[in-house]
């Protein structure tokens, strides 16, 4: 969740006289662990029924009947809601993606002549399950003839070639649906002549492994570039002369906050580490040398745009690792009493505005290791360096002591910039004395 001390860009826009509206089917925002995000906007709309959304109230569903058409690997306790939800999603207009973009059209029809507004259209698709209307699925024929298989579990690939092709075809179908409805949004921009005074950003949160590196999904395995390198497309009327150009500067999602705040004429908080993208849009001016990313408890990763360095702790043990929060909720649940019983207060970080936080032991798996979102142990957890210029698929780690030392030093600098707790440096073996 957003912490009390977190800077929220829609909240800052709202407090400076702007208006923010979000349209989403992203049901995680309405669970424990996400419930402080959507209320930062002036108004919000949610479309129900995506994936495992707790949507329909059926006390005794006939799961034997409902699940009989699904691949056995797809029948898990947590997919129950999805199977129930699909019994109510029969026609294209029942899917959340068309509904979301329809609501976006409604917002634009009402507000296109107004000024100083932000519309966030957050579509859960093409997230799993890769369930799309039949007309999109027909565009990607394959030889698979089994039960419905459009939700691969986060695990190593051990499916047949036909099953793999089926999952990928379903992914292609749902992506095509998103593409078509995004195109309808662009048509609405044409219809309302919004290109003259309205900026548009297209991006996402993460990628997904569809068998690359012999994995499905995310979270458990290393953060390969298929997961970390995400699309970013920006239109702004001030830079329309540069339309269609590619940019090569290294950027991160954190750069969107200062960028959007700058466009609204709102001051950028001092805690912000992202950089405005205005100069990137204008002339592809570099705004950072490196970007740091990763999963809590796993590797700390860094890239300079060419090399990607994934540095794991020597031991994945959760000993000496802590979580810091004033909002003790996890993904879909509250912290348990057992998790909080030994909590202590930790001094403020440089981003908490002078406020202390609870210091809590992290989740552990049965082996005492920090766990991946309650999914178990991190896998393939060894440090590696890739040269993505010569090896864009990250198939073969390289040895280059000079590059590794440079990126380790930059990782240390970045962690200091973000005021990472001391135990992180020790855990990763990059204490200052290393240099």
Report residues per predicted region.
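Catalytic-site neighborhoods of secreted/periplasmic enzymes
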Residues: 1-90
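Polar, surface-exposed loop/tail segments
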Residues: 29, 93, 101, 196-198, ...
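Active-site regions of oxyanion-processing enzymes, predominantly non-cytosolic
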Residues: 33-45, 76-85, 89-144, 192-199, ...
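A long, amphipathic alpha-helix that forms part
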Residues: 94-112, 151-200, 263
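Histidine-centered active-site microenvironments of extracellular/periplasmic hydrolases
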Residues: 129-144, 188-252, 288
């Amino acid at each position: 969740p957003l912490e009390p001390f977190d800077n929220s860009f829609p909240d800052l826009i709202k407090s400076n006289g702007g208006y923010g509206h979000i349209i989403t089917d992203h049901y995680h925002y309405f669970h424990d662990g996400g419930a402080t995000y959507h209320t930062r906007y002036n108004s919000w709309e949610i479309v129900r029924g995506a994936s495992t959304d707790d949507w329909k109230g059926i006390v005794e569903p006939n799961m034997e009947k409902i699940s009989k058409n699904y691949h056995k690997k797809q029948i898990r306790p947590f997919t129950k809601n999805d199977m129930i939800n699909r019994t109510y999603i029969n026609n294209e207009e029942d899917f959340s993606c068309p509904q979301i973009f329809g609501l976006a059209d409604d917002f634009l029809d009402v507000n296109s002549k107004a000024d100083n507004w932000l519309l966030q259209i957050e579509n859960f698709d093409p997230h799993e399950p890769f369930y799309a209307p039949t007309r999109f699925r027909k565009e990607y024929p394959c030889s698979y003839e089994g039960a419905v298989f459009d939700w691969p579990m986060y695990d190593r690939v051990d499916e047949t070639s036909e099953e793999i092709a089926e999952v990928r075809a379903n992914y292609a179908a749902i992506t095509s649906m998103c593409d078509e409805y995004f195109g309808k949004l662009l048509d609405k921009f044409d219809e309302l002549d919004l290109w003259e005074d309205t900026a548009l950003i297209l991006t996402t949160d993460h990628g997904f492994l569809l068998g690359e590196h012999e994995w499905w999904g995310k979270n458990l395995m290393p953060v390969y570039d298929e997961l970390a390198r995400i699309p970013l497309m920006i239109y702004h009327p001030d830079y329309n002369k540069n339309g269609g150009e590619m940019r090569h500067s290294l950027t991160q999602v954190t750069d969107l906050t200062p960028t959007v705040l700058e466009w609204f004429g709102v001051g950028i908080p001092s805690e912000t580490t992202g950089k405005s993208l205005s100069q990137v849009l204008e002339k592809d001016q570099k705004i950072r040398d490196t970007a740091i990313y990763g999963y809590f408890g796993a590797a700390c990763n860094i890239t300079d745009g060419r090399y990607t360095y994934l540095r794991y702790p020597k031991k994945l043990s959760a000993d000496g690792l802590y979580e810091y929060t004033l909002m003790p909720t996890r993904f879909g649940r509250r912290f348990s009493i057992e998790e909080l019983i030994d909590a202590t207060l930790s001094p403020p970080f440089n981003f908490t505005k002078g406020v202390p936080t609870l210091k809590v032991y992290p989740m552990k798996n049965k082996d005492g290791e920090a766990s991946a979102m309650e999914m178990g142990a991190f896998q393939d957890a060894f440090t590696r360096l890739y040269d993505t210029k010569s090896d864009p698929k990250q198939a073969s780690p390289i040895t280059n002591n000079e590059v590794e030392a440079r990126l380790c030093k930059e990782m240390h600098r970045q962690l200091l910039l973000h005021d990472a707790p001391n135990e992180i440096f020790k855990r990763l073996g990059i204490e200052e004395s290393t240099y």
